[in-house]
Structure formats: structure tokens, C-alpha cells
Amino acid sequence: MSMQDPIADMLTRIRNAQQVGKTSVTMPSSKLKKSIAGVLKEEGYVGEFSVNDAAKAELTVELKYFEGKPVIAELDRVSRPGLRSYVGKDELPSVRGGLGIAIVSTSKGVMTDRAARAAGVGGEILCTVF
């Protein structure tokens, strides 16, 4: 069976693993998923991540907790295969008054909404994290 939305699958795996208190989560790997994991690591939402280059590449993400609670309170998919969400540089959203981040796929790579604003580029809003 083919997967319709691999990014939504990644976000759901992270959300589910955090709800049951797992220390890490494993999923099929792709360049886009590695980029998203890199942004989440830079922003401090997850720990280290690694790619196992076996027959099928797998991405393992270490999850973070603070005082027993998951660091990620909310993880939502915005742009999806049935309804893509593209914004210009002036329309980039501010998540929860700047406390959260939006992960944006731009022509300069995958980055946060703040980095995209600083670079002066818009793109596809993949997801929001708070």
C-alpha cells in the first residue's frame, strides 16, 4: 500500500510516540523528512536524529521532554496533497504570537517562518509547531 502523505505520517508518528512517552521514533526516510527533522532539532523541539542506510532507509528521531511532558504541545499539518498552502514573503504566518514556528519549504530549502522572513522568501507552509 502506498502512503498518500508521508509528511503527515511523520508528524503523526512523532505526536503518537510523544503521547505514550517513547524516547525515540523510527519512520521511513526521505530528503524532505530529514530537512524537517533538522529544523525541529535546530529549534530545540527534538534531540538528535539519524538515518539508518539499510535496504530501506529509516529516520530515527530522539524525542525531548521537559518535566515529564513533551516539548511539542501541538504539531499540525497545514499544506496537504488535496489543498496546498503557498504564501508570499509578506504573508508568512506567526504561530501563537511568535512562540511557535511554521516550517516552510522555500526555493532556498526547508526553514522556519522567521528564517524565511529574514531571507525574504515565501513558499509552501508544511506544518506548524508549538
From Swiss-Prot:
One of its GO terms (cellular component) is ribosome. Keywords: Ribonucleoprotein, Ribosomal protein, RNA-binding, rRNA-binding. GO terms for molecular function: rRNA binding; structural constituent of ribosome. SUPFAM superfamilies: Ribosomal protein S8. GO terms for biological process: translation. The keyword Hydrolase does not apply. Pfam families: Ribosomal_S8 (PF00410). It comes from the Bacteria. PANTHER family: 40S RIBOSOMAL PROTEIN S15A (PTHR11758). One of the primary rRNA binding proteins, it binds directly to 16S rRNA central domain where it helps coordinate assembly of the platform of the 30S subunit. Part of the 30S ribosomal subunit. Contacts proteins S5 and S12. Belongs to the universal ribosomal protein uS8 family. This is Small ribosomal subunit protein uS8.
